[in-house]
Amino acid sequence: MTNTRKNHPLIKIINHSFIDLPAPSNISAWWNFGSLLGVCLALQIITGLFLAMHYTADTTTAFSSVTHICRDVNYGWLIRYAHANGASMFFIFLYFHIGRGIYYGSYTFMETWNIGVILLFMVMATAFMGYVLPWGQMSFWGATVITNLLSAIPYIGPTLVEWIWGGFSVDKATLTRFFAFHFILPFIITAMVMIHLLFLHESGSNNPSGLNSDSDKIPFHPYYTIKDILGLLLMILTLLMLILFSPDLLGDPDNYTPANPLNTPPHIKPEWYFLFAYAILRSIPNKLGGVLALVLSILILMLFPALHTAKQRSMTFRPMSQCLLWILVANLIILTWIGGQPVEYPFITIGQLASISYFCIILILMPMTSLMENHLLKW
């Protein structure tokens, strides 16, 4: 008798990816975030699809259509807040997932890591364009400020900005194209996720020890399916608490005011998950310099494999590197806080110091600490 699960052309792929997949026996809860990100992506696509059924991408009716969704559509408020807060959960898990990769040296899987960084850029672009769609004050001014950064590019900058805007300011053309891109990008992200997994399954998962685990593998199902379900339940619980008790906790009150090109909000700032990068952008007085620092603050992730000087892969047995990584985490929290503060003393200075230390820790201190640990271990 043939086993359909193992022989059917389509089911066989699922079987090799989620059922009979050999997984290390010691991977911790930090390895749960990959599956949670997959669930978040599915949730965002489903809620987004239902929102798109009622939303109109037109400057005169966009804000009203979102209000209509919340007031008149059956459970529209739930769909809208699940989508908005689902994005926040997505980024929390993304940052945990990346942090796990840095801590345990998962970046040595070069292809998987680089595709992951590209995925991060794509998710950030999608989230930014999604924030513009409700056409509130922060949507409009956020779009104006961030797209205007491209004008810092020498020679082609101003033309490029007008090309993206589809006119001489952020208007109907901008909103329509942002909606089109916001709709299509998650599907491209889904395809990229499949490539991300394809490369991961070429090498197999890393594990907390950073050692080769070929001699001690267990099947993914039932061990890690049940573990992922536990993570999923905790995620749903957290998300539901956020949606049902304080749906606007992470949002901006300014976005409940319809977009007005004649009235600038006192503090223009992006969603909380971009604040660290926004703080780095603002900490440099020069426009082009700020834009470069902004891009490099994310692009620097691609340098991690090249900056890995340690003889051990994981930080599990490297306390000095661990300490430095947690300092980096604290630094990012400081940057996130600064990004939400007005541009005045002492926040400017704190932001500049935090930005410098962010790049110094990654580019100088971490590789040097790894070399020192090698020396201390006489490796």
UniProtKB/Swiss-Prot annotation:
UniProt: heme b b566 binding residues: H97, H196
Q: Which GO terms describe its biological process?
A: mitochondrial electron transport, ubiquinol to cytochrome c
Membrane topology category: Multi-pass membrane protein
What Gene Ontology cellular-component terms does the record carry? mitochondrial inner membrane; respiratory chain complex III
Give the signal peptide as a residue range, or say none if absent.
none
Q: Which UniProt keywords apply?
A: Electron transport, Heme, Iron, Membrane, Metal-binding, Mitochondrion, Mitochondrion inner membrane, Respiratory chain, Transmembrane, Transmembrane helix, Transport, Ubiquinone
**Names of required cofactors:** heme b
Cited InterPro entries: Cyt_b/b6_C, Cyt_b/b6_C_sf, Cyt_b/b6_N, Cytb/b6-like_sf, Cytochrome_b, Cytochrome_b_C_euk/bac, Cytochrome_b_N_euk/bac, Di-haem_cyt_TM
Give the superkingdom in one word.
Eukaryota
Q: Where does a ubiquinone bind?
A: H201
Record keyword Electron transport present: yes
Q: Relate the protein's function as given in its record.
A: Component of the ubiquinol-cytochrome c reductase complex (complex III or cytochrome b-c1 complex) that is part of the mitochondrial respiratory chain. The b-c1 complex mediates electron transfer from ubiquinol to cytochrome c. Contributes to the generation of a proton gradient across the mitochondrial membrane that is then used for ATP synthesis.
UniProt protein name: Cytochrome b
Q: Which organism is it from?
A: Euryzygomatomys spinosus (Guiara)
